[in-house]
Regions:
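Short helix-capping/linker segments at secondary-structure and domain boundaries
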Residues: 18, 41-46
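A short beta-strand-loop structural module common to alpha/beta enzyme folds
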Residues: 45-55
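A short, glycine/small-residue-rich beta-strand->loop->alpha-helix junction that serves as a flexible
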Residues: 21-31
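Secretory-pathway luminal glycosyltransferase catalytic domains
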Residues: 12, 16, 60-166
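Pocket-edge structural micro-motifs
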Residues: 22, 50, 134
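N-terminal amphipathic/basic-hydrophobic helices that include classical n-h-c signal peptides
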Residues: 1-13
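Short amphipathic alpha-helix
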Residues: 31-39
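Short catalytic/ligand-binding loop motif for oxyanion handling, primarily in non-cytosolic enzymes
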Residues: 27-29, 55-59
Length: 166
């Protein structure tokens, strides 16, 4: 019996956890959810990280006020919990630590990688946990996810009215 390479690839991808950071305003959120959906369609297990918006819960923020306009539930995603968010921070610091590199030498961490949109490539998507942080402003991603985006944001009654009035 021969196993197809697609079957093997899908089994491998289902064991890779991808966390897409959601941040910015309405437009950036659309790009990020479209990108996350593209990864999900490829077979990755995808969650979103929305704790960026917690900094705006008190009045002493320095950046432009932003609000999570599009909750992850509209798009069928689950968000990371506080423990996962802390582990991501720790894993990133561990990977970047000069002391760790000095003690253990340069090593390739096969478990975790954090990629910015400028560093992203599918070839780097080979770790057990992948944290993707960026705006992912690629119009092709929006076009290929157009139906998904419209269906998702139409679950918000205010936004649905906007589509119905067009």
């Amino acid at each position: 019996m021969r196993i197809s390479t697609d079957g093997i690839r899908n089994r491998i991808l289902k064991k890779i956890y991808v966390i897409v950071e959601i941040k910015g305003g309405f437009g950036n959120q659309l790009f990020q959810f479209a990108f996350a959906n593209s990864l999900r369609k490829m077979g990755y297990k995808v969650k979103v990280k929305t704790n960026f918006y917690e900094q705006f819960e008190n009045d002493n923020f320095e950046n432009t006020y932003r609000k999570l306009v599009l909750p992850e539930t509209l798009f069928g995603f689950k968000k990371t919990n506080k423990l996962t968010n802390r582990l991501l921070v720790w894993a990133h610091k561990f990977n970047k630590s000069k002391k760790i590199k000095k003690i253990f030498g340069k090593r390739n961490n096969s478990f975790f990688i954090k990629l910015k949109d400028s560093d992203y490539s599918l070839e780097k998507m080979n770790k057990k946990v992948i944290h993707l942080d960026g705006y992912w402003q690629n119009i092709d991603s929006i076009i290929s996810n157009k139906k998904y985006l419209i269906e998702s944001i139409s679950k918000n009654l205010i936004l649905k009215e906007g589509f119905d009035n067009c």
